[in-house]
Curated annotation (Swiss-Prot):
It is an enzyme of class 2 (transferase). This is Apolipoprotein N-acyltransferase. It is a multi-pass membrane protein. GO terms for molecular function: N-acyltransferase activity. One of its GO terms (biological process) is lipoprotein biosynthetic process. InterPro entries: Apolipo_AcylTrfase, C-N_Hydrolase, C-N_Hydrolase_sf, LNT_N. The gene is lnt.
Length: 497
């Protein structure tokens, strides 16, 4: 294949892979695009050519999939258009290094000639995605396993091996398909592919967790405060009035407002206003969660915090996993100038504790996570199995009308699948939704509307295998596949595919 055509094809495959994610949910597409990528790797003349192919695929995937970053940087961060485009290109180039590394390793002749090559590709791909989601605080957005939530048969594996396990099985399926495309005389690849997907379907029939107690009434509030107005002092009174009305119209025991609902510090909030809202929650024998910034009592730092008011004793949750360059500046001596460029309010938060306990609210044990935190499944499970409900609060107004909010919703669907718990999402502009323990969106509000979502949610007890073991199971699977691939490649018994 001509070198330029190869790169164009790889880029197009990366772009097409985005259709597997929300809002499109075309989960079979990534199987095909990854299979064709694997075929390009198998037909690469050198590992370097395979690495460039993987890099170009990554540029297509991330270039098309995280376009919302431009909206955040330019429309709301007021970064110059050229600088915002440059920042997007640099991020995509960094993220594309991980599929490039996978292609480079798997294209070595010893591995490519081995019968264990599909397993090697799958293991290395999953390992690369885990590294991408971990290094430099991690950016696991568009991990391909998310594309399978919630409808794909592979989603049945989510409560067992999590999103990285789904990535592994998705790439394994794709690699088997690539080998069949290369050698259509052999049908054993279909046996492996069909077996994995059939097992996934069977796992979907298992209920790993059990309902506990009666369903609780919930109200998830969506204030729809425009991002370009939220931090303007002259709009503070209107914002507080909107949420006061939404709270007082809520008939539920558990009422949740979005992340930093009020653009002020907790210490600055009018106490009579908070008392009024708390009294409404108590009148329903329930509790209210409000998002505000909180000053540290020990230093000059501040936290992104959710506070509870109502029947239960006052409690709080402080955000632990902060967004780099959005909520804190890494390596300040090097990158401190970015604060002046982005014009993002409160862009240097302090980190909350990692070992925070669920909040006891409205008769439920509630594991709160704020915005970006629900991208990290291994951190969400730290409050389980004690928690009976998951709550994510967010301000996805930063994404504008891009595909970002829908992608974030799908990430929450994966967390519900992994944990066997309802996920309640309260966001500023959308998508505010109730997701059941199977990852299905039961109810949601229209985006960019001011409203409350009033419904019920069922608390769950018990633990999925993923809650018990985290990523340990997928690491064990990665290790076994890499060991098998290495032994097959270097033992002198390299039976070709």
């Amino acid at each position: 294949m001509n070198g330029y055509f190869r790169l164009i094809a790889a880029f197009a495959l990366g772009v097409a892979t985005v259709s597997g994610f929300a809002p499109f949910y075309l989960y079979p597409i990534p199987v095909v695009t990854l299979a064709l990528l694997a075929l390009l790797w198998r037909r690469s003349r050198t590992p370097g050519q395979a690495a460039l192919t993987g890099f170009t695929f990554g540029m297509g995937l991330f270039g098309a999939g995280v376009t919302w970053l431009y909206v955040s940087l330019h429309d709301f961060g007021h970064m110059e258009p050229a600088l915002a485009v440059l920042a997007l290109i640099i991020l995509c180039a960094y993220l594309a290094l991980f599929p490039a590394l996978t292609g480079w390793i798997t294209a070595f002749r010893h591995f490519r000639a081995s019968w264990a090559w599909p397993g090697m590709v799958a293991a290395l791909w999953a390992l690369a995605e885990w590294l991408r989601g971990t290094l430099f605080t991690g950016f696991p957005w568009l991990t391909v396993g998310y594309s399978q939530a919630p409808a794909s048969p592979l989603a049945g594996f989510a409560p067992v091996i999590g999103v990285y396990g789904l990535s592994l099985l998705l790439m394994l399926s794709a690699a088997w398909l690539a080998c069949w495309l290369e050698n259509r005389q052999s049908h054993r690849f279909w046996l492996g592919l069909g077996s994995v997907w059939l097992i996934g379907f069977g796992l979907q029939q298992i209920h790993w967790t059990q309902p506990e107690g009666e369903p609780v009434t919930v109200s998830l509030l969506q204030g729809n405060i425009p991002q370009n107005m939220k931090w303007q002092p002259e709009h503070l009174a209107a914002t507080m009035q909107i949420y006061a009305e939404l709270v007082q119209e809520s008939p539920s025991r558990l009422i949740v407002t979005p992340e930093i609902s009020f653009p002020l510090f907790y210490e600055q909030a009018p106490q009579d206003y908070l008392a009024l809202l708390a009294e409404h929650a108590r009148s329903r024998q329930g509790d209210l969660l409000i998002g505000m910034a909180e000053r540290s009592s020990s230093d000059n730092g501040y936290y992104n915090t959710m506070f509870s008011f109502g029947t239960s004793p006052e409690q709080s949750y402080r955000k632990y996993h902060l967004v780099p360059f959005g909520e804190y500046i890494p390596l300040k001596p090097v990158f401190g100038w970015i604060i002046d460029v982005l014009h993002i309010p409160l862009s240097d938060f302090s980190r909350g504790g990692l070992d925070q306990q669920p909040l006891d609210l409205a008769g439920q044990q509630v594991a709160v996570n704020i915005c970006y935190e629900d991208v990290f499944g291994e951190e969400i499970i730290m409050q389980l199995p004690q928690a009976s409900l998951l709550v994510n609060v967010s301000n996805d107004a930063w994404f504008g009308r891009s595909i970002g909010p829908r992608q974030h919703l799908q990430i929450s669907q994966m967390r519900a699948l992994e944990t066997g718990r309802y996920m309640l999402r309260a966001t500023n502009t959308g998508v505010t939704a109730i997701i059941d323990e199977r990852g299905r969106v039961l109810e949601q509000l229209d985006m960019f509307t001011t409203a409350g979502l009033h419904s019920t949610a069922q608390g769950f007890g018990g633990a999925t295998p993923y809650v018990r073991f985290g990523n340990s199971l997928v690491f064990a699977l990665i290790g076994l596949l890499l060991l098998a691939g290495s032994l097959a490649a270097f033992s002198g018994r390299r039976k070709t595919l």
